[in-house]
Regions:
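Conserved NTP-donor binding/palm subdomain of two-metal-ion nucleotidyltransferases/polymerases, i.e.
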Residues: 1-123, 129-215
Length: 215
């Protein structure tokens, strides 16, 4: 393991409150390697929170800290934007008679400490969509119905695969609408997945930020 990788792991421990300082200080050149590593791991925001907690003698160079901080501001603004877009798309499906659950990505924010929540590097929006309880007419999955709704909203057709389709609702954020949260290649395992999803889909709950996550 390189020194940059070791420092990266120690910064994560500091961010989580499991240590207070690095095992040894870094030179300016080593800090550049550390920054390259955290960028590669998409952990720029989380590690910067740790950098701010370092004692003065271990602090990263001022120039690097400023550039790091600017990137973190971008991440925080991006998180706010995507959370708002999650609210828009879930409300859109809600009005159309569907319940939805934000998978992976933004839903993971609620498992982060409040201090780190908006520093997570965001990506696209993955949304599991299904009919509300009592309005499913005995159908476990409404794949064709959901696809038609999306195509009508966009005024065009999009690529559809086994478990999701794209919904080009926002100019800079990809939305993947999932008919099921996941799938297996083995048909027997896949059937078990579908049964489990069907049995637990109503355990989805609404969070204060209007982003739905599984209990």
């Amino acid at each position: 393991m390189t020194k940059a990788e070791t420092v990266f792991l120690e910064l994560l421990q500091i961010a989580l409150g499991n240590r207070s300082r690095l095992s040894e200080p870094c030179s300016d050149a080593e800090w550049e390697e550390v920054y390259s590593t955290v960028k590669k791991q998409a952990m720029v925001g989380i590690t910067f929170y740790a950098v701010k907690l370092l004692p003065a003698e271990q602090m990263a160079p001022k120039r690097r800290r400023y550039q790091w901080a600017m990137k973190v501001l971008e991440i925080e603004e991006r998180n706010k934007k995507i959370c708002y877009e999650c609210q828009i798309v879930t409300e859109l499906f809600d009005k159309a008679g569907y319940q939805s659950c934000v998978l992976k990505g933004q839903s993971n924010l609620f498992f982060y400490p409040a201090s780190l929540r908006m520093m997570r590097q965001p990506g696209d929006i993955d949304l599991w969509v299904f009919r509300k309880e009592g309005d499913d007419h005995g159908k476990p999955f409404h794949k064709r119905e959901i696809i038609d709704f999306i195509w009508k909203k966009m005024g065009k057709r999009t690529e559809v695969n086994l478990h999701h389709t794209d919904f080009d609702l926002f100019p800079k954020t990809l939305v993947e609408v999932h008919f099921v949260p996941s799938f297996a290649v083995n048909p027997f395992t896949n059937r078990k997945y579908y049964r489990w999803f069907e049995a637990h889909k109503q355990s989805v709950s609404s969070t204060p930020a209007n982003i739905n996550i599984l209990d």
